[in-house]
Amino acid sequence: MERLRRTMMFVPGANAAMLRDAPLFGADSIMFDLEDSVSLKEKDTSRALVHFALKTFDYSSVETVVRVNGFDSCGALDIEAVVLAGVNVIRLPKTETAQDIIDVEAVIERVERENSIEVGRTRMMAAIESAEGVLNAREIAKASKRLIGIALGAEDYVTNMKTRRYPDGQELFFARSMILHAARAAGIAAIDTVYSDVNNTEGFQNEVRMIKQLGFDGKSVINPRQIPLVNEIYTPTKKEIDHAKQVIWAIREAESKGSGVISLNGKMVDKPIVERAERVIALATAAGVLSEEDI
């Protein structure tokens, strides 16, 4: 079954209550943050807290992600702690080159081997947050088989570009396009950046519709209120599901007749239409709005 990554919810690593309650939020992925949301004096405590949470609480209903610090800080300690605790994905901040991925993977693999953990169990995600990273997105996306996705980090990116965030998001168009194309070429997920104005519901929904139209798999979120809004937009509608089912039935009918020609309502059905229908079915099934018996 396809892994849903419609929503990736940031949870501050220093917030014990949110760590405990994270599975209740309804996000597809929960990202415990040990980087920007944690002050220097709280780094060690937060690392221990996230390790404890991963070992203690039941996160089986969600994908667990930890955003670690860079190697210029305490990144190696973060990686070791969360790999030992069984995290699903490590998110690298401020990734600029493929070598950044290779360096982090080496630490992950060392920890896995030294502790008899299945090598390759811990996956990776790269956050791209600078002009250098955007221009190297293709190489970054193909740097490791552990990579499940790349994500845009807009706040650092716009600062690096000597601009700021605007409501229409035009300042992010090139970065989004580069990251999306790199992800698709590598066969991994593309996750959009956060929308920081949690009180602007209309603006948030418009941005989610736009990034879905571009082709992103999902969006990072910073407030539980944003989760159902994203999930609803990214979940196939009844109309989309019904059309996809008709395409699948048309394929089966053609196969039963031994025909290589597929038609629906008098129109030819070509490979891209079939692939889109199969993806709609996969997403709807993963989201729980369609059962295999209904197909």
For each feature predicted by the language model, list its residue ranges:
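Expand to "…catalyze enediolate/carbanion chemistry for C-C bond making/breaking, isomerization
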Residues: M1-I295
